[in-house]
Amino acid sequence: EMEVICSIAKKHNLTVIEDSCEAHGAKYKGKYIGHWGDMSIYSYYVAHIVSCGEGGMVSTNDSFTADVLSSTRSHGRLFNSIFFDHPRVGINSKMNDMEASVGLEGVSLFWDTFNKRKEIIKIFRNACVGFEDVAWFSEEDEGNVNCPHGFSITCKNARDIKIIQTTMDKYKIHWKRNFGCIPTQHLAFSDMGYKLGAFPESEWVGDNGLHIGCHHYLTEEDVSRVCKTLKESLSLCSKKENI
């Protein structure tokens, strides 16, 4: 609900920082993710559409914010100064030329990579047709475009997630759990004071979901093996449901 968030921020003079880390090329209501807020954050982690191996980028249209960010990433040194002037405390978060060159090549290949991954996700989704009673799958609403970061599956029955994980392991298909609810399922944020159960829907996704890769270098054989494994694991869930 970005319109509502931006409206509240404007009313109370707040800054909107968009977490666009895994949303390269994604759209919300026809508008690219990253265009809504005052600042947008992108990650160049190795699994993302554009990768530098590590690192990331912050984008903004505000020149003052850009100067502060550029200063902060370089030990707090005054941006564009030839002297060692430090008006603020900063960190060392500068990307080296080697990493940047890898990222620039990724930018030049962006849409080829994006479209190839979208194609693979579509194949995975087609393999899951008929199993909508078992799980929720990666979907797109009208006017929205998902970033093809991975193919997500969230089980509707808590007992099914282990079946899918075990079947994936059997055929050596790598999977990762869905991201847990930050305030209640990550120990690092326990000081926020929330107890398990405060965010039941988010916690369900964290406990009962997983995602698998859709890397653009997957071969036809790789994709076929994943589809076969998806069908087998979801079929086992359906059979258990009927017992």
Task: Give each language-model segment a name.
Residues 35-74, 97:
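Active-site PLP attachment segment
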Residues 15, 21, 217:
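A short, conserved beta-strand element in the Rossmann-like catalytic core
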Residues 8-12, 16-18:
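C-terminal EAL-domain catalytic cores of bacterial cyclic di-GMP phosphodiesterases
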Residues 16-18, 42, 60, 177:
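Hydrophobic residues in well-ordered beta-strands that form the structural core
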Residues 18-52, 81-85:
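Conserved active-site segment immediately N-terminal to the catalytic lysine
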Residues 1-4, 11, 27, 63-243:
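PLP-dependent aminotransferase class I/II
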